[in-house]
Design a protein with these regions (language model features):
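Cysteine-centered catalytic environments shared across enzyme families
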Residues: 1-165, 177, 181, 375-376, ...
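Phosphate/oxyanion-binding loops and surfaces in catalytic or ligand/nucleic-acid-binding neighborhoods
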Residues: 18, 36, 108, 140, ...
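Short, solvent-exposed loop/turn segments at secondary-structure junctions
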Residues: 96-97, 120-122, 152-155, 197-200, ...
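Short secondary-structure boundary/capping segments
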Residues: 162-164, 205-212, 464-465
């Protein structure tokens, strides 16, 4: 049996990214199997792994009427994922990807269709709610829509969510995913989702930023230094997110090779701030460079792809695999629900991924190819809507409904007992967030999730804490036609 010695290079990556990439785990003697790999145990040779699938490397010519081809490929993938012995439901956030999947589903089948969406209430609800778009899409295609009400009193959910995930995981979408999976799983055993559309069709702001960064990196170093000096003078607006900090890192002179630049976009809590977070006794044992080494290795393994392909490849191998897919699958299975991901189907990926960068994205327009393919199929409002992301309003929750909980979990006495973190630094992060001087939701959520996980997996006997069949939180659901 493996010892429960913590792997602090892996955990440092967790505090940097919000998740732990495979093959690492929180424990030094435990490893995960990477996606697209098989593992074979032989009595004499021991354990060996082999990669059996990867994203295609070669470019393919862009066919004429590529938008029509993409629409057909999407329909084929959704139809393949509808094959089931039991009724199928769908997650519908109102965003472009889930709307595209539901539209294809409606075109493929005349059977009754039922989708579920999140409706937020309380602190920060307006910033997260996409119910109006979900309602419009459901009405356009005759889909029964159940709105799952999400209130900010989620304190009792965090422990069962953490235990379902098995390891520290700081993605703020965990709470709405849990409540939606709970609601869907009460009536269905299979559900479609729109996961994977951002990674396949270049839907994140970081993809545009990455391409801009490639042009910026070609400027003379003296120009870069001047722009960086001006950016350093920018003050972060009260209550601002990470945007100003990321801009400063983006404009840093000679801001690294392609994998390091992309890692900068994914980083939630950078060095040296992260290094200062740790207790003095721990700092010398944390290199702070584990994620960079891992990203560079992935990049070289795939032949150092250029342009947008580098960003999309790293997104697939890191964020999609170890954050989004891992979280959604584990939470859904905690409710005996199988989620299906037609936008991650290997046949669709093998057709779309090798297409030209210029087809997929414009200088200021993400998902250009997908939006053109869906023109006439989705309402114009869906095609123009800004991206929000499927996350709850955790910044507001931490300032209000969850404030007492995080104050308890990160109390100086508990931190001193754990011995991992500097209580003064943590207190400063809390004060920054509560006073709205800075938005510290990302690192505070990561610390909160780690504390809950540590109590269940390190401080208690090694037996896995049970995941309740149902949490005490009962979401309010209402159906609309």
């Amino acid at each position: 049996m493996a010892h429960r010695e913590l792997d602090w290079d892996a955990l440092d990556t967790y505090f940097q990214l919000g998740y732990i990439p495979a093959p690492a785990t929180p424990f030094r003697e435990v490893r995960k199997l990477e996606p697209g790999h098989t593992a074979v145990w032989n009595r004499t040779r021991g354990l060996s792994t082999r990669q059996y699938w990867d994203l295609p490397r070669a470019r393919t010519p862009t066919p004429r009427d590529v938008e029509a081809h993409v629409a057909d490929w999407l329909d084929e993938s959704v139809q393949a994922h509808l094959v089931s012995d039991v009724p199928v439901a769908a997650f519908l956030s109102g965003g472009l990807d889930s709307s595209a999947v539901v539209a294809s589903w409606a075109l493929a089948s005349d059977a009754p269709r039922h989708a579920f969406t999140a409706k937020y209430f309380g602190s920060g609800a307006a910033s997260a709610d996409e119910t109006d778009l979900a309602r419009r899409l459901a009405a356009a295609y005759g889909v029964t829509l159940t709105e799952v009400d999400i209130h900010p009193d989620v304190r009792d959910l965090l422990e069962p969510i953490t235990y379902a995930l098995d390891e520290p995981h700081a993605d703020e979408s965990a709470v709405p995913t849990w409540l939606l999976s709970q609601a869907v799983g009460a009536s269905y055993k299979v559900a479609l989702t729109g996961i994977g559309g951002d990674e396949l069709f270049a839907g994140y702001r970081r993809h545009i930023g990455f391409l801009m960064g490639e042009h910026y990196a070609r400027l003379p170093r003296t120009v870069q230094r001047g722009v960086s000096a001006l950016a350093h003078l920018l003050r972060e607006p009260q209550g601002a997110s990470l945007s100003v900090d990321r801009l400063k890192r983006f404009l840093r002179p000679g801001n690294g090779c392609a994998p390091d630049r992309f890692l900068g976009y994914l980083t939630r809590f950078p060095n040296p701030d992260r290094h200062a977070l740790y207790a003095p006794a721990l700092r010398d044992h944390v290199s702070g460079a584990a994620a960079s080494g891992w990203f560079r290795d992935l990049y070289q393994r795939h032949g150092a792809p250029a342009g947008l392909s580098a960003a999309l490849y790293l997104d697939y191998k890191t964020f999609l695999a170890d954050d989004v897919l891992a979280l959604s699958d584990r939470i859904a299975m905690a409710h005996a629900l199988e989620i299906r991901v037609p936008l991650v189907d290997h046949e669709l990926v093998e057709r779309v991924f090798p297409l030209s960068d210029r087809v997929k994205i414009g200088l200021w327009r993400s998902k250009r190819l997908l939006k053109r393919a869906l023109k006439g199929r989705l309402p114009e409002q869906h095609l123009r809507a800004p991206k929000r992301g499927f996350v709850g309003p955790t910044a507001a929750w931490l300032r209000h409904e969850l404030r007492g909980m995080i104050e308890d979990e990160l109390a100086p006495a508990r931190l001193q007992r754990l011995g991992y973190f500097d209580p003064t630094v943590v207190r400063g992060l809390l004060d920054d967030h509560f006073s709205r001087r800075h938005n510290r939701a990302g690192i505070l959520w990561a610390l909160l999730c780690f504390s809950i996980w540590h109590r269940g997996y390190v401080e208690t006997p090694p037996a896995r804490p049970p995941v309740p069949e149902d949490s005490e939180y009962v979401p309010h659901a209402k159906a609309a036609r």
